[in-house]
Amino acid sequence: MTLASAPASAQLKLAADFCTAEVLINDRSVCVVGPYSPTVRLDITQDLRFGSNQICIRLQKSAGPSAVALSIAAVDVAGTQLLNTGPHWTALAPGTLQDLGTVRSQLWGIGSASLDLSGADNYEQWRLATAANSETQVAKLRARPGFKITRLRTAGLDEGSWVSMAFDPAGQLTIAREDKGLLRFARDSDGLPAGAAELINGDLLECRGLLYAHGALYANANNSKALYRLQDADGNGTLEQVEKLREYSGGVGHGRNDLALGPDGWIWSIHGDSVDAPAAGTVFDRTSPLRDSRRGPVRQEGYVVKVSPDGEAAEVVCTGLRNPFGIDFNSDGAAFTYDADNEFDMGTPWYRSTRIWQLSPGLDFGWRVAQGQWPPYFPDRADNSVWQLDTGKGSPTSVMFGKHLKFAPDYQNCLYVLDWAYGRVLAVHMAPRGSMYRMAGELF
């Protein structure tokens, strides 16, 4: 790579699958990534020089289809200079280099708005909305080019704050109020919510998760501290039969959150670290029994539990989360969430940012309340296989795959996650890698 001057700035991106990759610039090692690491971005301004620069990638293969991709963008007096891996590179062992094509632009961040926040972005800017007395104007919202935002409905003065929603089999919208109760909205000729809200339940407190499945409405009622099933037993359109299927004791801050229908037909529920773990013997626990000796007197960790449709059986799927609000499944049947950071740890060496996790059975993601989180070298902690996407500061709420949306294919396969703190939606692109996925995010 030849530069007309010392660079004003230079950025490197590196991705390696099923191999360890070390990048050397002018015989100096600047970056090493493991076989299953996320895509790495690195400032290499100080590593490049005026004139000719030698870029070398040293690879060590592991089991699987090894591949590497690298790009460098350097700004000098002549403009932006680009260098990408490709067939023009030279392999030290002749005949060993194979061109596998280009990386999808979304996975490489080409044409995408960055997730990065500046130090000036106020984490508590949401407080500015507490004094709002009118609806948000669509003109103030920004979307990715090619997408349009349409306001469907604004909460009425007597409809409260909304925390979750679901569509019934007839396509009518059900919304949970933050304080208590469930509202139902009829549809107009265009299929949009219309008319006055109908109160279909006034007792359940803060239902953060709603799911229509198996001829019933399931509600994860956080402040009622239980999972409920609501049914229309007499077919008159009202959900008069309310059953408590599972009770979950504990606090309510990081509480009983979203619900999703698993590919196994069970009801998957995701909880934050305020909720007590199910008592031993009441559920089947897929995590390691070796965790017991390291739990401490108070467990305080978020977890995923799946419940049979009738509530009779339950299993803890994975644990060690902080406050993951949403859960959804991709087309392959894999579950994902968007987990919270501990904002009070910002600036400390042990700060753990918000991140996207694949919720594979048996995993412990290592979170323990406050500073009790496990180090990554504990043998049954999922950090040994590396987190999949670091999303920085934020406050995670709901997540949803676009598989049912009438979007372009690249955006049907995305996981959409809502960051409440900064009022933004992130689109997470994925590519299969073994039993898991490589991920890249963009501001949607």
What name fits each language-model region?
Residues 1-10, 44-49, 400-406:
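Extracellular and analogous surface-interaction loops
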Residues 50-121:
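An acidic-aromatic loop/edge-strand motif
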Residues 120-444:
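Beta-propeller domains with acidic blade repeats across secreted/periplasmic ectodomains
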